Amino acid sequence: MQQKNRSRHRHMTSFQVISLGFLSVILLGSLLLMLPIATKSGQSTSFSDALFTATSAVCVTGLVIKDTATYWSLFGQGVILLLIQIGGMGIITIAIAIAVVSGRKIGLMQRSTMQEAISAPTVGGIVRRTQFIIRTTILIEIIGAALLAPVFCRDFGFWKGIWYSLFHSISAFCNAGFDLIGIRTPFSSLTSYSVQPIVNLVIMVLIVVGGIGFLTWEDIKNHKWHLKKYRMQSKVIFMVTGLLIFLPALYFFYFEFSNVPLMERVWVSLFQSVTPRTAGFNTADLTLLSEVGQMLIIILMLIGGSPGSTAGGMKTTTLAVLVSSALSVFRKKEHTHFFGRRIPDDTIKNAATIFLMYIVLFLVGGMVISSTEDIPLMTALFETASAIGTVGLSLGITPDLGLVSHIILICLMFLGRVGGLTLIFATLSEKKLNGSKYPQEKITVG
């Protein structure tokens, strides 16, 4: 029997290990959040509410049914923060780190799984990369907490201020969007700090750094400002990230927040441009945005961050590959390329698959929630985009949704964090993936 179990474990794919790892942590987190000690009232939380919160934390989303500051006790907040940290850094990253510290040998299976988890190009040097990720993550989160501490200690007292600084630093870096400022007004996020420069700047930098990907950090570490030496993926990530911050910020500045004072207008526009790509904090009331503004945020939420990062969504590279592929068709070029490097056809197929999957799930989920809850379709689509993009922004309807809608959001959050292709490959065998080829025949499109 033991030999059979070991054999089954050996034949599990990397994708299955990653998916089951996330599921296991979500279930354990749900059980911990159901304990009476996890709430300020001392009462147990229902399994559905605990499951939703644990999924949102592990999948670094930030959608909540219960306000984090007013409902959960210090123990409950600690569990949520731990789940955020595990989900942000990755289940496999944590597991490899524990194995290294305990002196255990890291086998090829573990190295291959880690490669998939952080989107590394090769298995070689994966343990060294894991150690680099752990050290850099801890360092950045400590620096972020130290920079936030003067503001939060001033507003909430020393010890609570330290806790709030650490919580928000980790939540921002992991692109989670959970906050404790609901102690002022429940579900208000960071709206009370909309003109506070330190909070705005630190949170935005943490979001961007956490969302550009671990391999991009490696390029920064190895090559400093010599951008020409960066791998092509890092160059694409910097280009797309810059555009997705600058262009939406311009729109928000000129069309959505034109009636507020200049400095507040600058901070609010910039923050609302950065946060939709999977962070989940907000410094403005999103219900007051026009439908165009809300649709722009939906698009940003679906795009998400970059591969191998703490962020979710389709990923910046997916968008870049699809746009570049379309441009190559318009220009009648045979291949898609970036910075003098050709993109493999398999990558383009994967990008198209991911895009189609996200759009279909986003639309179907939104339509089901809209019909079930009898709410406007735009409001429901905003919620499903936030879930599948693992963002956490909401128009305020999350706590009032029914069980069916919550289950839909849970599934979307999980899929958005684990990744569509990961889930597909986890359910398919090698034999199915390597099917026989059929005769080719053209079909007219467009």
Where are the regions a protein language model picked out?
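Membrane-proximal intracellular helices of multi-pass ion channels
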Residues: 1-446
